[in-house]
């Protein structure tokens, strides 16, 4: 297997695994919204975001499996993948913010914590995309080394989001939000783990 192929596959797997953490949740900003209405919007947007990430990773893996791929090709694929991730994450955060804060105890604070986490992870992803655009393509060994380093840096992408989820979990008194989401049909795919890998049924970890 060509070094580029191995690197791209590993990078795609890493990103997909990190994106799957989003199944934990993400919350909006604005006026208080009925919890069930907010939950339906949240789950719909989250599932769409996760499926987009999964499809992107699948497409990347398929293209990376071409034995004739060159370092330049590999760089272009990585940049395209990360650029799409940056755009989709921004859109995801914007949609959740527009949904308004869930009308529960600490709803506004929960919203702020999660949105901050999404923004932080989005910023890290954007920074990684900048690095990807500067990846050397000659000699091939230089690309492999730089791509490997990028893949390692990618492991920290979810840290801001995870911190936001942890903070939200502590704010979700009595797991109010989590309990509501488990009753919504729009959230079934997140609850049963059929979207993403390692997903969880609780939005706030409470």
Regions found by a protein language model. Give the residues of each.
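Short, intrinsically disordered, charge-biased short linear motifs at domain edges
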Residues: 25-32, 169-177
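Disorder-to-helix initiation segments
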Residues: 30-46, 60, 67, 71
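Short, low-complexity, Pro/Ser/Thr/Gly-rich segments in the mature regions of secreted, periplasmic
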Residues: 182-206
């Amino acid at each position: 297997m060509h070094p580029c192929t191995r690197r791209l596959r590993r990078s795609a797997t890493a990103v997909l695994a990190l994106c799957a953490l989003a199944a934990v949740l993400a919350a909006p900003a604005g006026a208080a919204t009925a919890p069930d209405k907010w939950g339906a919007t949240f789950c719909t947007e989250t599932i769409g975001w996760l499926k987009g990430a999964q499809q992107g990773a699948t497409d990347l893996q398929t293209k990376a499996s071409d034995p004739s791929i060159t370092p330049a090709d590999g760089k272009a694929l990585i940049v395209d993948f990360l650029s799409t991730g940056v755009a989709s994450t921004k859109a995801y955060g914007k949609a959740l913010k527009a949904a308004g804060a869930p009308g529960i105890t600490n709803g506004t604070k929960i919203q702020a914590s999660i949105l901050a986490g999404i923004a932080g992870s989005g910023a890290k992803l954007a920074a990684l995309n900048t690095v990807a655009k500067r990846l050397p393509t000659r000699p091939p060994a230089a690309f492999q080394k730089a791509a490997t380093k990028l893949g390692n840096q990618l492991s920290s992408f979810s840290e801001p989001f995870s911190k936001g989820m942890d903070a939200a979990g502590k704010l979700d008194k009595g797991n109010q939000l989590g309990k509501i989401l488990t009753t919504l049909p729009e959230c079934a795919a997140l609850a049963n783990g059929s979207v993403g890998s390692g997903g969880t049924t609780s939005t706030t970890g409470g």
